[in-house]
UniProtKB/Swiss-Prot annotation:
Function, in words: Endoribonuclease that cleaves single-stranded RNAs at uridylates and releases products that have 2'-3'-cyclic phosphate termini. Preferentially cleaves single stranded RNA at poly-U sites with CU, UC and AU sites cleaved less efficiently. May target mRNAs encoding proteins involved in lipid metabolism to regulate their expression. Regulates levels of TBPH protein, but not mRNA, by an as yet unknown mechanism. Important for neuronal development or function.
PANTHER family: ENDORIBONUCLEASE-RELATED, PLACENTAL PROTEIN 11-RELATED
Protein name: Uridylate-specific endoribonuclease EndoU
Positions of the EndoU domain: 53-322
Chief location: membrane
Disruption phenotype: RNAi-mediated knockdown is late pupal lethal. Conditional RNAi-mediated knockdown in pan-neuronal tissues or specifically in cholinergic neurons results in significant lifespan reduction with some individuals failing to eclose. Individuals that do survive to adulthood appear immature bearing unexpanded wings, soft cuticle, unretracted ptilinum, dimpled dorsal thorax, and misoriented scutellar bristles. Surviving adults also showed sever locomotor defects. Conditional RNAi-mediated knockdown in motor neurons results in some locomotor defects but only mild developmental or lifespan effects.
Organism: Drosophila melanogaster (Fruit fly)
Listed EC numbers: 3.1.-.-, 4.6.1.-
MF-aspect GO terms: lyase activity; metal ion binding; RNA binding; RNA endonuclease activity
Any one of the GO BP annotations: regulation of translation
Subunit structure of this chain's protein: Monomer.
Subcellular location: Membrane
Catalyzed reactions: a ribonucleotidyl-ribonucleotide-RNA = a 3'-end 2',3'-cyclophospho-ribonucleotide-RNA + a 5'-end dephospho-ribonucleoside-RNA
GO-annotated cellular components: membrane
């Protein structure tokens, strides 16, 4: 009898253990299911649909600015200081124009801002020096573009370009459009392939001791930190309405070369910068000004094309708020 009782107890213990294991399995499965359903409910109720596709860039720019749900967390302060003129040679701004949250930039490695700034050391400054893009550089280009393509700002822009029959609805076609438009290397003279739309607009170039481009506030801030830019004062600025956001024209020196006037947007995201420049260049008639509205600030985006191997690329594009 004792042997039978022990066997019965052993069987009962095994069944109890199996039951407990099954319960844990069911509970874990239920928790995972609830988590997945909760995420889908969150997405459904909290992700708003994109606004109706506009017919003109002016309306598009208003919609794009509305998608900038928050100001750049990386921009701590804008020090405008003294007003100047393009013909002046004195320094009316002893402090840097921008102060950044460097620690936050270091932590947010996958943000469009961090991915943009990762590209800043991939290029030769002098357009007379041949560019030699490495596989790593090309990968960093695609990492940045894919991140930009994932934003609501660029999704809305691409839908506008599809509406204008400029690009297809296919993701790969849209990615290719941005890659070719912004990152195709071309020559600005002497047959030396030492430039690109991206390098000119989002960074800066030097040709025959003249500063070209530099129409992105993040590159300006980066070069200030490195001691390559010396801000001399502002010529004109229009506030957009959100903290630290404006259309700004400035005077400065870059590598000790004077730049009497230069314009860029301040405090906006890389995707909004790229979206505005892309839409204006592709959807506006050749050499025609492109009128935009970002909050309280109205401006005109000026663009000039560069023909290269049968392609229509960006020679320059920048905002003018005067």
């Amino acid at each position: 009898m004792d042997a039978v009782q022990q066997q019965t107890n052993s069987t009962s213990n095994i069944d109890s253990a199996k039951c407990q294991k099954l319960k844990r399995f069911v509970i874990v499965g239920l928790l995972i299911t609830i988590g997945i359903l909760s995420w889908h409910f969150y997405e459904y109720f909290h992700s708003k649909p994109l606004p109706k596709t506009p017919d003109d860039v002016l309306t598009l720019s208003k919609n794009l600015y509305a998608e900038e749900t928050e100001v750049s967390p990386y921009l701590y302060k804008v020090n405008l200081q003294g007003k100047t003129t393009s013909g002046a040679h004195d320094d009316r701004a002893p402090r840097n124009l921008f102060e950044l949250h460097q620690d936050l930039l270091a932590r947010d490695a996958n943000s469009t801002t961090a991915l943009l700034m990762r590209l800043f050391d991939n290029y030769e400054l002098d357009v007379a020096v041949q560019e030699h893009p490495t596989p790593e550089h090309v990968q960093e280009q695609y990492d940045f573009l894919r991140a930009v393509m994932g934003t609501r700002v660029m999704k809305l822009t691409m839908r506008f370009l599809v509406h204008k029959d400029i690009v297809s609805v296919e993701y790969d076609d849209q990615l290719r459009l941005l890659q070719e438009l912004w990152f195709t290397p071309y020559s600005r003279g002497r047959g030396i392939v030492g430039s690109s739309s991206f390098e000119h607009v989002f960074m800066a170039e030097i040709r025959d001791q003249k500063v070209l481009g530099l129409h992105n506030w993040l590159y300006f801030a980066d070069q200030e930190q490195r001691g390559n830019v010396d801000y001399k004062g502002w010529l004109n600025h229009k506030e957009m309405g959100k903290h630290n956001q404006m259309v700004l024209s400035v005077r400065y020196t870059f590598h000790n070369i004077n730049k009497p006037v230069n314009g860029f947007f301040v405090g906006i995201s890389p995707e909004l910068d790229m979206a505005l420049y892309t839409a204006c260049f592709l959807a506006t008639a050749k050499e025609e000004p492109c009128h935009i509205q970002l909050g309280h600030a109205s401006a005109t985006i000026v663009s000039h094309e560069w023909k290269w191997n049968g392609m229509r690329l960006i020679g320059t594009v920048y905002p003018d708020s005067s």
